[in-house]
């Protein structure tokens, strides 16, 4: 139950920060990433069913994943958070930021933030048109 409450606060926090991204991009914290990595598939899916009722949040079922993804919209685009599970544990976390109008400030903020995370996390960052893709794994 405690994990569910933390997870709910995490999602609300991410949603709040992404909505305010038009002025300043506030990105998911290291602590929030660690919470996601400690969440099992069942808990993740149960929480997203509940959060799907929020106006700015939507659960998605991607073709290549049996678990849900979380899509949160903000004024300049959206973010999709997708954990990939192996044996019911998060093996990798995919975060996709899409900006309606992307600029150097947006890309630099995202890249610098994710490159400065914990040394125990390995990141792969790819920029393609208006998307910034971040894949995170435990090293």
Where are these regions (language model features)?
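Short helix/turn-capping signatures at newly exposed starts of structured segments
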Residues: 17-123
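Beta-strand-connecting loop/turn residues
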Residues: 88, 130-132
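Short, exposed beta-strand-loop hairpins at the edges of beta-sheets
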Residues: 123-129
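Classical Sec-dependent N-terminal signal peptides that target proteins to the secretory pathway
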Residues: 1-23
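Short, low-complexity, Pro/Ser/Thr/Gly-rich segments in the mature regions of secreted, periplasmic
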Residues: 132-139
